[in-house]
From Swiss-Prot:
This is Somatolactin. InterPro entries: 4_helix_cytokine-like_core, Somatotropin/Prolactin, Somatotropin_CS. GO terms for biological process: animal organ development; growth hormone receptor signaling pathway; positive regulation of receptor signaling pathway via JAK-STAT; response to nutrient levels. Belongs to the somatotropin/prolactin family. Pfam families: Hormone_1.
Length: 230
């Protein structure tokens, strides 16, 4: 186990500069100009960068989930989680999961669905970073990956907002999902409950990150080959 974690740490050191390098172009914060850089990028280029950003977020969230599972989740608890009882925080969002339903979504709803997913995860990831501090022997690599995803989700949110303005010529729809208390902080949980809750968060994040990537790639396909986007 120690050797495996060490190997993963070495991979993280190799991957870390790459993550920051490829994600910088989508970071729309530029001094006091807020979204000054993103509007200057063409729609096609911005969509490509948003997709690449989503791919990286999915990859790192998948690695984070696997690392957490190896470090803290025995096999019986993994099976218990897979059997249900731990609902994802985005379950109530009006976003379809089946392939046929996703294919029927308009470009507008694809973009707004991605935005809803991104915004729904910003607060829970802040919580996750705080709770990981309670763990004994939590590897720095896991903490760093979680922090990276948290920061880059905000950057992705900015990119999608500009993309909505460019492609749909409108502002983003206002959602009060997170304001309604969809994510609750439980301060009286036992340690095992903390572990299972955090594991559920990481598992659901991985699924939703993959969904973001899928929606954006479908949108890209429609721009280039509208009738062959299966």
């Amino acid at each position: 186990m120690h050797t495996k974690v060490l190997q993963q740490g070495l991979w993280a050191l190799l991957l870390w500069p790459h993550l920051f390098t490829v994600s910088v172009p989508l970071d729309c914060r530029d001094d006091q100009a807020s979204l000054a850089r993103c509007p200057s990028i063409s729609q096609e280029k911005l969509l490509d960068r948003v997709i690449h950003h989503a791919e990286l977020i999915y990859r790192v969230s998948e690695e984070s989930c696997s690392l957490f599972e190896e470090m803290f989740i025995p096999l019986p608890l993994r099976l218990q989680s897979n059997q249900g009882g731990y609902a994802c925080i985005t379950k109530a969002l009006p976003i379809p999961s089946s392939k046929s339903e996703i294919q029927q979504l308009s470009d507008k709803w694809l973009l707004h669905s991605v935005l809803m997913l991104v915004q729904s995860w910003i607060e829970p990831l802040v919580y996750l970073q705080m709770t990981l501090d309670r763990y004994d022997h939590a590897p720095d690599m896991l903490l760093n990956k979680t922090k990276w995803v948290s920061e880059k989700l905000i950057s992705l949110e900015q990119g999608v907002v500009v993309l909505i303005k460019k492609m749909l010529d409108e502002g983003a729809m206002t959602t009060t999902y997170s304001e309604q208390g969809a994510f609750q902080y439980d301060v009286q949980l036992e340690m095992l409950e903390y572990v299972m809750r955090d594991y559920t968060l990481l598992t659901c994040l991985k699924k939703d990150a993959h969904k973001m990537e899928t929606f954006l790639k479908l949108l890209k396909c429609r721009q280039t080959d509208k009738y062959n986007c299966a």
